Amino acid sequence: MPQGNNSRRTVLPRSQEGNGGEQRIAKLLARAGIASRREVERMIADGRIALHGERVNTPATLLTGLSGVTVDGKPVRAASATRLFRFYKPQGTITAERDPKGRTTIYDRLPRGLPRLMPVGRLDFMTEGLLLLTNDGELKRQLELPRTGVVRTYRARAFGQVTQAQLEELAEGVTIEGVHYGSIDANLERRTGRNAWIEMSLAEGKNREVRRVLAYLGLQVSRLIRTAYGPFTLAGLEPGGVDEIATSELDAFRQTLK
């Protein structure tokens, strides 16, 4: 598997920096790949993070680096170069590190030898397709934020009848049971008997959004595949397959982010 050989310095907004280059500990730990910033905040609340042996009580603690910081008693390594991987998540896997019910997780399907990786967003248990993985919690957060505008594309096989005109109405957004879903570009690809294949592109990632929107149209989804996340696609990957995105591609993509 190719290795990234270039690092990319993230320019921090002034509001997130302290004096003398200090940064919040939650941000530093996210950048080091410990977890997302929100997850780091939970770890601090649970008393799992310490500085020189003393428990850290707030994610707003300002530091210039991670020297002396431990997580669960283990020293934290300095951040390495940002890396991004494509993973074809199979059906029947959980997008989590562990599952109380004992179901297979994405980490059970990943090969050994990879760095510590975090998923960008989630795919539910029966959804398959492209899941991006990164060692950089700040990149993860940036790609997940709706304001970043990264488009996710899905193909759904659904039982029932729908017209292209109905799908085009989704471009205006739709509110279902009090939850508003933003503009969706939806196209009827083909019909096979009572089933239809529909492609949908959207720039947000609300929980089970595609399934709920199609159910609102009277359709029952029997298969759902995420085929793209931004410029990255499933091309060349089989279920369970993983590869690394070239550093040059990652850098070019980051230049386009809002």
Residue map of PLM features:
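Basic, flexible Lys/Arg- and Gly-enriched helix-loop patches that mediate nucleic-acid binding at interfaces
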Residues: 2-258
